[in-house]
């Protein structure tokens, strides 16, 4: 083959076979470059963007339409969700063909439509916008070291547009503007002509055309040489900050940029000097920046995480702002015009011939027969309305001090009113300086000066009312608000209407004010008609004085009824009586209520009375009680606040007042201590009065005696003591009488026995389980008799049941032998005849005894064996020393009990058996032991 290939000359790139290329990427590259030999249609494979086979068999995955032969995404295809609610109704959704197309099919569809690509975008705006949006979309999906959106400067289109390429080929250079040079020159020429025509003088003979022609030549030469260039942005805005290159801090907040720019321009225009900061000082550092964050630490190494928290705070700027404010106030005067020349703005000239004339209109002439129906007078016009004509003008007095005194006094009287003049006249009767008040020296000048001050004050008040107060801005009162809302006004009393009618809209000094401090005619009539203490004239007089001085100027009097002969307690009681009587009179109570309040016979109240402050008292009937006129006055009460137990529990705090009684009311002074007497004295006196008023007939009636059962209140006993203590201690502590005591004792005994039985049963059951013994059930114990029950409790071991049964059988045998002996003694003649029977009986008895002794020996042997086994188990298998001790104690007690039981058995058998039988039994025992 090598020799064959040398004979041929190859031109171009060889076409490769698809079967020879194994790699998918190489195959894709060869297919894209056109170096791959085409196969027939039935052998070709369709692949997607990533080189994956599309139309393959259904059993291997089917149609490749998504994420690695899956549908949609890695998780799979998500169906459309349908949501509809009352607030958000689901609308009719229009379906398009793009909803059912694959990505490859969409690409094929877009290839058929015409759209400007990024390559043919003229200035690259579309490409830049597309790349910026794509970068913002990726920013949300992936984390980034730079937070926020990506700056526009970092995102630039990859390729230049075709328009930029064409402009560069046509001779355009970057940085130059694209416009006609002649257009700008023509515009400048026209503007220069207009400017020169406006400012040329009439007397000048030189025409503006000559000037224009000269400038045209100069500019045309300059324009030919100079090519117009677009001024770069960085020349217009030079860098004056410490930010990074290209960084704009006001990108997302342009309003702050404008504010800063206006502030800087204002500072330049005004021209005031900035205060010397650390940057401009001679002793300041050359860097111009003082490290504000001193707390970072000088010895620590700077790291990425060590950030200066004060780095963004400009200390110099705050220092400048603090010192700028007074400087601005001082420089405001420079902006003012020193002289207005012709009242013309700069850059304009005043017209010599002005056709404008100000047209004025005269006020309308009022006809003579006009009658004014409406008068709009001010609220203070009635007060300041002069009753007499103006006094004549009088020259001031020669004495300068008197003149100053008159002028100052006149202004003060016009401000405060005529009342101050009357008071000054009364107080300064002997002073010669105030003779002008008594028509003396300087009276005419004072009258004239007072009138002038009043007129001046009247004009000022009118002016302020016209300027400030208008019908729409007036302060809304309660009456106007109610009328606007349609509310029904409350009914006023007769007293309020009289006072409002007498006022007349202007302030008047109350003429009846003295009636509250002196005795008026109406109060004298009421005092004569109502005398609650007429039996005691001195007390009645003190009561009247108390009513007069009850509320003097709104304050309670202290020494209203001071009598030297009375004690403190009597005076306090009298004060309380007077208060109660006054309250009863004011509220219009009936005769019985007043009598109950004062605790004295009051036969005076024919009708209710109401005391007022002015002297317009009104007598009302007893049936009608005016609740509005009744006045209640506040009273001070002092008491100790105690928290609720639930509140203390909620806050997890101990109750500080648990088990403590509330304290008695503390006496504030000596009179209160005498007034607040204990209630026991009152109760004792009331009891004595009730006993004296009981008639004698009631004493004869005998009341039936009622037997009261006294409950035995027991002391609280501890739970442990109630369970495990003896009944004798309880009997000593709790003495009882009669049947109740006996019944209680029986109950205690029954409870103690049942409790002991339960405790013993539980203890024995637990002990038997530990030792491996069987414990009899409770039902078996109940079926036995009482002595057996007691013996079972004492001897609770295996084989004990059989021993007790044998004991009972031996007792029955003994009783039968006694009966047979008695029969023998009664019938001595029959002994010979009954020898055979007795011998047979005795032989039967001997056999039974032998069997019993054998069983007894076996039992003893088994008991000894079990005890030895138990002893060995106890020594080897016990877990603690306490259990060993308890088991040894139980063992000893059980051995003692068994030994006693054996003795009782032997004694009983010796009673009912003969000596021979005992001897025989002993012999047999010895033989067995040997």
Swiss-Prot record:
Residues 159-199 form the G-patch domain. Residues 76-152, 478-508, 687-751, 773-930 are annotated as: Disordered. It comes from the Eukaryota. SURP motif repeats lie at residues 405-447. Keywords: Growth regulation, Isopeptide bond, mRNA processing, Nucleus, RNA-binding, RNA-mediated gene silencing, Ubl conjugation. Residues 848-857, 892-908 have a biased composition (Basic residues). Disruption phenotype: Developmental defects, elongation defects of all organs, reduced plant height, triple cotyledons phenotype, reduced vascularization and infertility due to failure to produce pollen. It is found in: Nucleus speckle; Nucleus, Nucleoplasm. This is G patch domain-containing protein TGH. The gene is TGH. One of its GO terms (biological process) is siRNA processing. GO terms for cellular component: nuclear speck; nucleus. Residues 489-498, 779-808, 858-877, 913-923 have a biased composition (Basic and acidic residues). One of its GO terms (molecular function) is primary miRNA binding.
């Amino acid at each position: 083959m090598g020799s064959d290939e040398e004979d041929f000359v190859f031109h171009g790139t060889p076409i490769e076979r698809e079967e020879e290329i194994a790699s998918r990427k190489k195959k894709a590259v060869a297919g894209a470059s056109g170096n791959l030999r085409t196969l027939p249609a039935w052998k070709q494979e369709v692949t997607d963007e990533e080189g994956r086979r599309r139309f393959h068999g259904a059993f291997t995955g089917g149609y490749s339409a998504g994420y690695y032969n899956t549908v949609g995404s890695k998780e799979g295809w998500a169906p459309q969700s349908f949501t509809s609610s009352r607030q958000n109704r689901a609308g009719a959704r229009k379906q398009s063909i793009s909803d059912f197309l694959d990505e490859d099919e969409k690409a094929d569809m877009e290839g058929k439509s015409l759209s400007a690509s990024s390559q043919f975008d003229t200035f690259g705006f579309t490409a830049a916008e597309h790349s910026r949006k794509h970068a913002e979309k990726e920013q949300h999906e992936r984390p980034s070291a730079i937070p926020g959106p990506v700056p526009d400067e970092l995102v630039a289109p990859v390729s230049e547009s075709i328009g930029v390429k064409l402009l560069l080929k046509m001779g355009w250079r970057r940085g130059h503007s694209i416009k006609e040079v002649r257009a700008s020159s023509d515009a400048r020429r026209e503007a220069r002509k207009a400017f020169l025509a406006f400012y040329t003088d009439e007397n000048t003979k030189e025409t503006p055309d000559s000037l224009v022609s000269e400038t045209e030549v100069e500019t045309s030469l300059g324009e030919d040489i100079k090519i117009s260039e677009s001024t770069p942005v960085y020349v217009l805005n030079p860098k004056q900050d410490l930010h990074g290159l290209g960084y704009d801090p006001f990108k997302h907040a342009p309003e702050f940029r404008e504010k800063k720019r206006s502030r800087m321009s204002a500072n330049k225009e005004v021209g005031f000097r900035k205060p010397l900061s650390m940057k401009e000082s001679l002793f300041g550092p050359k860097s111009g920046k003082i490290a504000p964050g001193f707390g970072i630490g000088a010895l620590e190494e700077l790291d990425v995480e060590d950030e200066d928290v004060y780095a963004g705070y400009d200390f110099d700027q705050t220092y400048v702002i603090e010192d700028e404010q007074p400087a601005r106030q001082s420089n405001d005067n420079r902006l003012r015009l020193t002289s207005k020349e012709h009242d013309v703005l700069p850059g304009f000239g005043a017209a010599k011939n002005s056709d404008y004339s100000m047209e004025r209109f005269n006020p309308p002439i009022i006809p003579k027969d006009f009658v004014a129906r409406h008068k709009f007078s001010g609220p203070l016009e009635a007060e300041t309305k002069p009753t007499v004509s103006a006094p004549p003008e009088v020259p001031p007095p020669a004495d300068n001090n008197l003149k100053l005194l008159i002028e100052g006094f006149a202004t003060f009287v016009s401000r405060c009113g005529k009342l101050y003049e009357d008071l000054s006249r009364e107080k300064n009767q002997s002073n010669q300086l105030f003779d002008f008040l008594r028509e003396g020296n300087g009276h005419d000048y004072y009258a004239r000066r007072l009138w002038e001050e009043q007129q001046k004050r009247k004009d000022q008040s009118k002016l302020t009312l016209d300027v400030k107060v208008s019908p729409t801005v007036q302060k809304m009162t309660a009456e106007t608000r109610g009328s606007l809302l349609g509310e029904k006004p409350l009914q006023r009393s007769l007293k309020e209407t009289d006072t409002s009618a007498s006022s007349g809209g202007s302030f008047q000094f109350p003429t009846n004010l003295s009636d509250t401090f002196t005795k008026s005619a109406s109060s004298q009539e009421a005092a004569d008609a109502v005398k609650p203490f007429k039996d005691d004239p001195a007390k009645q007089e003190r009561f009247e004085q108390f009513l007069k001085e009850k509320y003097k100027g709104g304050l309670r009097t202290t020494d209203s009824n001071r009598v030297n002969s009375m004690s403190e307690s009597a005076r306090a009681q009298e004060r309380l009586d007077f208060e109660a009587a006054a309250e009863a009179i004011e509220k219009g109570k009936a005769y019985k209520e007043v009598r109950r309040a004062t605790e004295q016979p009051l036969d005076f109240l024919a009708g209710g009375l109401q005391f007022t402050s002015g002297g317009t008292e009104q007598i009302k009937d007893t049936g009608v009680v005016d609740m509005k006129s009744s006045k209640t006055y506040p009273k001070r009460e002092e008491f100790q606040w105690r928290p609720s137990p639930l509140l203390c529990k909620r806050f997890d705090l101990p109750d500080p007042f648990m088990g403590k009684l509330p304290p008695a009311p503390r006496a504030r002074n000596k009179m209160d201590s005498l007034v607040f007497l204990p209630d026991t004295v009152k109760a004792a006196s009331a009891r004595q009065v009730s006993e004296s008023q009981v008639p004698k007939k009631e004493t004869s009636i005998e009341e039936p005696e009622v037997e009261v059962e006294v409950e035995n209140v027991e002391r609280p006993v501890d739970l442990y003591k109630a369970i495990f203590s003896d009944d004798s201690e309880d009997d000593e502590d709790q003495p009882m009488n009669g049947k109740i005591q006996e019944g209680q004792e029986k109950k205690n005994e029954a409870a103690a026995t049942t409790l002991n039985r339960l405790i013993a049963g539980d203890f024995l059951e637990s002990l038997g389980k530990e030792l491996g013994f069987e414990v009899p059930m409770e039902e078996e114990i109940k079926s036995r008799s009482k002595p057996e029950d007691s013996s079972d409790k004492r001897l609770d071991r295996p084989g004990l049941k059989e021993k007790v049964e044998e004991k009972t059988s031996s007792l029955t045998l003994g009783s039968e032998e006694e009966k047979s002996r008695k029969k023998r003694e009664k019938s001595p003649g029959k002994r010979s005849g009954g020898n055979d029977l007795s011998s047979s009986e005795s032989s039967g008895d001997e056999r039974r005894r032998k069997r019993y002794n054998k069983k007894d020996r076996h039992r003893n042997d088994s008991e000894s064996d079990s005890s030895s086994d138990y002893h060995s188990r106890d020594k080897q298998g016990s877990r603690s020393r306490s259990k060993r001790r308890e088991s040894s104690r139980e063992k000893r007690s059980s051995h003692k009990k068994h030994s006693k039981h054996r003795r009782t058995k032997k004694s009983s058998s010796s009673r009912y058996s003969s000596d021979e039988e005992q001897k025989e039994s002993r012999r047999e025992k010895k033989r067995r032991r040997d």
